[in-house]
A protein has these predicted regions:
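Short, glycine-/small- and polar/acidic-enriched structural segments
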Residues: 36-222, 238-244, 267
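Pocket-lining segment of extracytoplasmic ligand-binding domains
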Residues: 137-139, 147-148, 207-208, 212-316
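Extracytoplasmic/secreted proteins, especially bacterial periplasmic and envelope-associated proteins
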Residues: 83, 87-90, 116, 120, ...
Length: 529
């Protein structure tokens, strides 16, 4: 998962390189045959002082039964090249724990291995060559079936960061919503966070099951984000799920735009550390100190640029300015954010990602969520961080100008529902039934925590068409109140009463036939994307 944001000057140079590549060759795109996700006989780049022994077979290794309690207590940790791991690098000050570093002062030993291939790192974790690995929650859910097949129990006790603009979906200018994807040629890096993001939106849309299957089955699977980005700018794709710097390129181009990026959701892609459960259970104090070291580093690392250059090759030639710009794509997570995320957000995101992978034919272990997010290691630090308050829900500052703009722009994601109200009132006919329907929408609103939510009430009325009906407005307000009562910032919500101006079936039909006219439409909009 290599992602970075170049400065403006860097973007010009890199974009010129992409154009040169496109002009200099005929770029073909085709669907890839799905690889065996358990195969590990590819060459793997491992940069470290002690080499990881990679699996030489095409089979999933069996979880090691070695007695971790009798080994030297060293955390063998794999990380891919991503800016979000920087506090860990800073706390260690090298591939091995440096004398006087944060981890050294805490009395723990960490060996960092740079492995960009999640297949290789997961096999090393299963075999016991690694005690921990850095993965997104998306990736962890993808690997959960593999871990279960190998008999490996894991825990994910800490998250270092969330993607905050580093990942997204770029599209041609005429594609403005998830619904527009039905006839589009969409490219994704196979089995990536970007692919999971696209499928998540499809799964949570109002598209028919047939339309969803068509889109998912026709995704163009590419090897990586670089190939996906190049295919998009070569004109071979209408839509590409990718990460930086390709989002910036789309923003700078004349006929493309960012359909969605993770500034509008700080929960869709979370980066954390997965430990073997046997290691964590045998050395809980070591795991807690490791987490403490991350939190300490958060206060210090931003003035240091050399450590990441020395450890991660992709940053070796980057200027301080470029590294600082790249940091903006990852929002760091402290003690309070971890407590909140582990307890409230992670089970929901994990379940959604299991839905994603199952919808494309992968096997996952849903029950892992019952033990994966063990808060005991973080909460062992509660005395030290007791003064750190749990962060309030993300506040989206929306100006009146943006509210007006939101009314006129297309919705990135639209969902409709039918809620029964008492006749001629704005009161739910059945509170429990209404809650069961709206809870799905509230969960989406919590995940897409940077979007504007437009709630529109509609009526069935066989008479003169009119807009702004007070009853439909009041019913939309009732739905808004439910959202607010369940933790959604009222400032994010726009209420519209359509009266009967947007009926979609004959209003003279039966009560059952005219239910679509009584629907509530909920739009998730990305103003400024």
């Amino acid at each position: 998962m290599k992602r970075y944001k170049a400065t403006f000057a860097g973007r010009i140079v890199l974009f010129a390189i992409i154009i040169a590549v496109v002009v200099g060759c005929v770029f073909g795109v085709s669907k890839f045959v799905k690889p065996n996700k358990d195969a590990t006989n590819e060459s793997v780049k491992v940069i470290e002082t002690t080499k990881i022994n990679k699996n030489e077979t095409n089979k999933v290794p069996v979880a090691s039964n070695k007695d971790v309690t009798n080994e030297d207590v060293t955390i063998n940790l794999s990380l891919d090249e991503w800016i979000g791991w920087e506090p860990i690098l800073y706390a260690n000050q090298g591939f091995e724990t440096k004398d006087g570093s944060i981890f050294d002062e805490l009395g723990i030993d960490v060996k960092i291995h740079i492995i960009n291939d999640a297949d290789a790192s997961s096999n090393a974790l299963i075999k016991g060559d690694l005690s921990a690995a850095g993965y997104t929650l998306n990736r962890t859910s993808f690997l959960s079936g593999k871990f279960a097949d190998a008999g490996l129990d894991v825990v994910m006790p800490v998250f270092t960061n969330y993607s905050d603009g580093g990942d997204g979906i770029i599209a041609m200018s005429n594609i403005t919503s998830i619904e527009d994807l039905v006839s589009a040629k969409i490219g994704v890096p196979k089995f990536s966070e970007a692919q999971s993001m696209v499928v998540w939106f499809i799964n949570n849309s109002d598209l028919t099951d047939e339309q969803k299957s068509t889109i998912i089955n026709n995704l163009v699977l590419l090897d990586d984000a670089e190939q996906t980005g190049q295919a998009f700018f070569a004109g071979s794709l209408d839509v590409a799920a990718t990460w930086q710097p390709y989002l910036s390129y789309a923003e700078d181009s004349t006929d493309s735009h960012i359909l969605f990026d993770t500034t509008f959701s700080n929960k869709l892609i979370l980066d954390g550390i997965v430990f073997r459960s046997d290691f964590a259970e045998a050395h809980p104090d070591v795991v807690s100190k490791f987490i403490d070291g991350i939190f300490i580093a958060l206060e210090e690392y931003e003035s240091d640029f050399d450590t990441i250059r020395n450890i991660m090759p992709m940053f070796a030639g980057m200027s301080d300015e470029d590294i600082a710009a790249t940091r903006m794509d990852a929002g760091m997570m402290d003690y309070a954010a971890n407590v909140k995320t582990l307890e409230n957000d992670c089970p929901i995101i994990y379940s959604d990602m299991c839905d994603v992978w199952e919808s494309i034919g992968e096997t996952v272990n849903r029950s892992l969520s019952e033990t994966l997010f063990d808060t005991s290691y973080v909460k062992d630090l509660s005395d030290k961080y007791s003064s750190v308050t749990v962060p309030a829900p993300k506040v989206v500052e929306i100006t009146e100008e943006q509210r007006t703009e939101a009314l006129d722009i297309p919705s990135m994601l639209t969902k409709s529902c039918t809620i029964e109200f008492h006749p001629d009132t704005a009161k739910f006919q059945d509170n429990a039934e209404a809650a069961a329907i709206l809870d799905e929408f509230v969960e989406i609103a919590k995940i897409l925590d940077g979007t504007i939510i437009q709630i529109e009430g509609n009526l069935n009325y066989n008479g003169k068409i009119y807009s702004g009906d007070s009853l439909s407005t009041k019913r939309a307000e009732t739905v808004k109140k439910y959202f607010v009562a369940n933790g959604i910032d009222a400032n994010r919500i726009i209420v519209v009463g359509n009266g009967n101006s947007k009926m979609i079936v004959d209003p003279a039909g039966s009560v059952e036939d005219t239910m679509p006219n009584r629907r509530t439409d909920i739009f998730f909009k990305t103003v400024g994307a």
